[in-house]
Amino acid sequence: MNLDEYVRSLRGEVMGHHHGGPGRYEQKFKAFPISFLPKEKHSLESGGKILLPPSALNALSRLNIQYPMLFEISNPISGKKSHCGVLEFIAEEGICYLPLWMMQNLQLKEGEFIDIKNATLAKGTFVKIQPRTSNFIDISNPKAVLENSLRKFATLTKDDEIMIDYNNTKYYLKVVELKPANAISIIEADVSVDFAPPMDSKEATSPSTSSPGSHVSGPSKGLTFGPASTSAKPIPGGKKKKDESDSDSDSDDEPKFKAFAGTGARLDGKVGTPLGTSPKTLNTNNNNNNNNNNNNNNNNNNNNNSNNNNTKNEDTKFKSFSGKGHSLKD
């Protein structure tokens, strides 16, 4: 039995089970990957939309399901759920074609049944994506590539791992966070995009805590803040090396330009000490001995001077009636 015969045998099984209540569409389909379609349809693998049969369009029209038509798809065996849009109604009756990444998220095998029902989702405002590998971040402008690729999607579901194709390379991206709900519509929505560190990066594999002194991983590419390390390299010019300090100390002994450093003239004729210079320091013991000797000499000189001054003062002191006297008898 070929695929067409198998599909015809399923028509009686799946048709007529599409009403889940007033205004609600629900039906079972056999799931097959996009690769079962002609080659010109294989580009649908890097999108988030499915193909349904024409009978599904008729049923949706009778139920007045309005555009955009969004669906919740689930695997009744594993219980996995996701969301999607519909691109065309050209599939064979009883068949639903899905991108391979979507089947992998739902843990579906070829030909297994899936439940499809219409859904109403809020417009998304924020999405955080985590690439599986770092090569996606190495693209010159990954954010622009992602925003352009998301035009092929109608919905996003938290924890799904979507696939996009860029320059003949497949990139797998995990949906880490969504706002305002865990499943959103991105059709005509103004959505902010952010990146988590890739799964194979150190920022994603190393545990992070918020305790003081620990590194905290930030958004986008894993910038790291933290306290300054004590073993960090010195800032240039902030700390001198030993040989530099020695050279600086040696340079202090070298003559430098000093203003008014000429020899001064004194009124008493003695040679003055040049301004801006200071006599070299001598040994403290010699200085003390010299100072003591100088003090003793000064004391002796002072004593001699005082004696000489006393004798001079006595000789030059005015004395009354000190002349030679004469008697009247003479």
From Swiss-Prot:
Pathways per UniProt:
Protein degradation; proteasomal ubiquitin-dependent pathway
Q: A Pfam family name for this chain?
A: UFD1_N1
Provide one Gene Ontology biological process annotation: ERAD pathway
Origin organism lineage: Eukaryota, Amoebozoa, Evosea, Eumycetozoa, Dictyostelia
Bias-annotated ranges (Low complexity): 206-222, 283-310
Q: Which keywords describe this protein according to UniProt?
A: Ubl conjugation pathway
Q: Which family does it belong to?
A: Belongs to the UFD1 family.
User: Could you tell me what this protein does?
Assistant: Functions at a post-ubiquitation step in the ubiquitin fusion degradation (UFD) pathway.
| Location of the region described as Disordered in the Swiss-Prot/TrEMBL record | 198-330
GO CC terms of this entry = VCP-NPL4-UFD1 AAA ATPase complex
Recorded protein name is Ubiquitin fusion degradation protein 1 homolog
Which GO molecular-function terms appear in the entry?
Answer: polyubiquitin modification-dependent protein binding
